[in-house]
Amino acid sequence: MPLKAAKDSIDLGIFVSDIKKSLAFYQGILGLEKTEELVTGFGTLHRLKFGTSDIKLMDPKQVPPVGAIGLEKQLGIRYVTFVIKGLTELCTELKGKGVEFTIPETQIRPGTRIAMVKDPDGNILEFVERG
């Protein structure tokens, strides 16, 4: 039986090493809105909104070791994509705030531009603007 979507997006959980740095990045720099803070058995979940998607930052009771960082360093989910408007302006702002780019603003095909950056733990975020 195929999955039946209850909403038009998926949510993502990211375990972080320093919740203050991560919230400063995702809320303060990217402007995501925090909608919930929930204590769980293994840490505190901080729910942030991007459109209809939830980005769930988990502040674990015990911080696990960091795995390999980079697009081609290990199998599994390697980056998160945000489809946005205003890529050039965002890139200018991120550069001004010292955010590390793994791929600067680049046209990957006519009408589609991307940029990739690292969050405070080295997780890679892709920003895409189409049209």
Question: Which sequence ranges carry the predicted segments?
Answer:
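Conserved active-site tyrosine of GNAT-family acetyltransferases
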Residues: S22-Q27, L94, G122
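Conserved hydrophobic beta-strand within the GNAT/NAT acetyltransferase core sheet
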Residues: L12-I14
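Conserved beta-strand-loop-alpha-helix junction that forms the acyl-donor binding cleft
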Residues: V16-I19
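Short glycine-/small-residue motifs
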Residues: I124-F127
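Short, conserved charged micro-motifs
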Residues: K21, L87-L90
